[in-house]
Amino acid sequence: KAELPQLLRTIPQLEPAERAAIGAAGNAARGQIERALELKEADLAAGEIAADDAIDVSLPGAPSLPVGHVHLITQTRRDIEDVFLGLGFQVAEGPEVELVEYTFDALNTDVTHPSRARTDTFYIDDDTVLRVHTSPVQVRAMIAQPPPIYVIAPGRVYRPDNDATHTPQFHQVEGLAVDEGVTLADLKGTLLAFARAIFGPDRDVLLRPHFFPFTEPSVEVDVSCFNCDAGYMRDGSRCPLCKGSGWLEVLGAGMVDPNVFDYVREYGYDPDKVTGFAFGMGVERIAMLRHGVPDLRLYFDGDLRFLRQFGAR
């Protein structure tokens, strides 16, 4: 029914003189139409191939791969920070390569104290060390801000130790609260709130006398064991976690020694007017207790069988 074939069929009916010219014109037109159709067909085929190969940018990037998560140490540190931020503390930070002055001298640590020995501290030179605790951050915070001050100092610290419960590099969170009328009862109340937030609402804390150069009095702080009842399991056996004591050693603390305040007296810390408490804990230790990790080195071995047990929260 197309017009061109019908026209070509009428050629025999034409005068002989007209047949050749009209036939040639008709064939030329048919050739042009066929070539145009072939080109169009090729374009459509190419478009279909392109559509098959097109990338849908709305699809997930790698749906078959498991999503990573925060490392257990990072998550534990964040949990600790959240507790103290909720209690009104602020986060303070400082350098990891620190002055001996801020690491020891300002913290009432005598020149003969064993912690200053090269067997216990990484020395860069005679005046500079890799910090052995984040306490220098507290000194810097007091120099930068007059009282009252409530800060925590999380960060990496370094000591030449390497065994199941010690690594050359680990993480601490230390805290400092200085104001008028701060007492040991305030310290205990703060740490009780921390213990219940981290280890459970039924926990209690026990303060045992101890010695630290920068606090007086000084205490070791234990948390009631959450794995047993007063040191014993339901079957009557001794608790493997607390070794039957009913308590778990968690951190060290105490009231800031007046000699520390005397070092920063010119910045508003008159030991006759202000008092304060300080505390410090190892993040790895907290994570070990919360999650039953037996060896500190597991945190840093990069073993995915271990790391995948602790997903993001």
Where are these regions (language model features)?
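Core structural elements
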Residues: 1-4, 51-53
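Histidine-centered catalytic/metal-binding microenvironments
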Residues: 3-7, 11, 22
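TRNA-recognition modules of translation machinery and tRNA-sensing kinases, especially anticodon-binding
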Residues: 13, 17-313
